């Protein structure tokens, strides 16, 4: 059952392919912020996926994170997530990323539970984000 307190941890090794220089988010050969964000989203997403009803999944809707320490290629990094709030279909997670020396990033991430078929039908042309009327919200799309 989906409930607050669900935790997850995933890890990876920093390689030349996920540095700021390689992904274009900077010029240095250190773990890229966009890659850390991806790790955080993936960690949160897969923590709750086993609890989704058939035909449902989650989509990311917000991130508020800080990247507080650089990590060179060759080190292991990992993310830990915890589901801290459930508000209808909106899920809020605390996310933290670490390397072998300590904390490298932290913050909050929100995801929204959606019906897969409905969501994909709407994103494939029946509703475009660029054509949203002022009164429409993400909830209207799912």
Describe every region a protein language model picked out.
Residues 115-122:
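A short, polar/charged loop-to-alpha-helix boundary motif
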Residues 38-42, 46:
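Short, residue-level hotspots on alpha-helical faces of the histone-fold
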Residues 130-137:
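Conserved small/polar residues in nucleotide/adenosyl-binding loops
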């Amino acid at each position: 059952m989906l409930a607050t307190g669900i935790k997850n941890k995933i890890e990876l090794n920093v390689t030349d392919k996920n540095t700021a220089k390689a992904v274009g988010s900077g010029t240095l050969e250190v773990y890229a912020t966009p890659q850390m964000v991806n790790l955080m989203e993936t960690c949160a997403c897969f923590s709750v996926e086993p609890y989704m009803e058939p035909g449902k999944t989650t989509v990311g809707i917000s991130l508020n994170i800080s990247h507080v320490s650089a990590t060179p290629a060759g080190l292991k990094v990992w993310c830990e997530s915890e589901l801290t709030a459930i508000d209808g279909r909106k899920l809020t997670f605390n996310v933290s990323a670490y390397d072998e020396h300590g904390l490298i990033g932290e913050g909050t991430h929100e995801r929204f539970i959606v019906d897969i078929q409905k969501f994909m039908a709407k994103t494939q042309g029946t509703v475009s984000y660029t054509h949203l009327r002022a009164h429409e919200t993400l909830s209207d799309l799912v």
